[in-house]
UniProtKB/Swiss-Prot annotation:
Its main location: cytoplasm. This is Peptide chain release factor 1. It comes from Bacteroides fragilis (strain ATCC 25285 / DSM 2151 / CCUG 4856 / JCM 11019 / LMG 10263 / NCTC 9343 / Onslow / VPI 2553 / EN-2). The keyword Chloroplast does not apply. Belongs to the prokaryotic/mitochondrial release factor family. The gene is prfA. Pfam families: PCRF, RF-1.
Amino acid sequence: MADNNSILEKLDGLVARFEEVSTLITDPAVIADQKRYVKLTKEYKELDDLMKARKEYMQLLANIEEAKDILSNESDADMREMAKEEMDNSQERLPVLEEEIKLLLVPADPQDGKNAILEIRGGTGGDEAAIFAGDLFRMYAKFCETKGWKMEVSSANEGAAGGYKEIICSVTGDNVYGTLKYESGVHRVQRVPATETQGRVHTSAASVAVLPEAEEFDVVINEGEIKWDTFRSGGAGGQNVNKVESGVRLRYIWKNPNTGVAEEILIECTETRDQPKNKERALARLRTFIYDKEHQKYIDDIASKRKTMVSTGDRSAKIRTYNYPQGRITDHRINYTIYNLAAFMDGDIQECIDKLTVAENAERLKESEL
């Protein structure tokens, strides 16, 4: 159990800042400055959670002291029994709350509350890899549905035998990036492909990248330097062909502030038949691409301090194997194995994400000075 005074001192030191932020977010001048306002409202939520925890912590300590006093001075059996029960309950809750407070005091990834861009690409394995990429997309789509999140596809390149060579979509909702970020990496599948005539098990792979979606003020883009092209998009022929140029392609020269190297970014968006909507989505992906490159330095800095593979941001790392003959899924980062593959592929992935979250929280606690 942590030192009560140490925890209270840390919490008491945040009271003045909480009161200051509470006042600032009602200031019209602050509300007019959207970048500052968004930052302060996030800080307010974090501090509000800490203030609620502080109130409960102080109440538990008071309950214990009051119960001790009753047990020392009261002779009535019923009163003593009630006091003993109150003290036991408070002493049981206290260490649990202390761990919760420690986590609240350790800085979380500032991007956790953001929406996300989800990118899935078929890797080694040809047609089977594309089919598996499609399976992963459906898995995430069903998971997002259970979370009440909104998923919108911005571009898709279908595989010849089904699935996707590449599919990119945006996911909006509460704490999307903080939940899905653990899915970044290489997902490996072992199964008998539908095209396999000998019944042999093949190994294929698909890569998943989860990027925090950038907001307009997260990155600076000179929109006057963007080169736009439009083109027709749609199906292979007949009535599915889009007869107007609704597809958009943008090119933008960007200098990476971390390396000093300039690179050309090329983004296409063909998902809707509305050119302005496609331009809006392409621009959002451009912002996210640039923001992700800059955010990667933050992830690398965190990873260098930790031995865990849970959240290193290394998208080339093999993170999970899906073994169909055995109905088994293994997450290699935490040596976690489950045998409910059918349910997992149907979107039931929260338990695995919870285990990964616990593992990362343990690493965060090691960094805490408490």
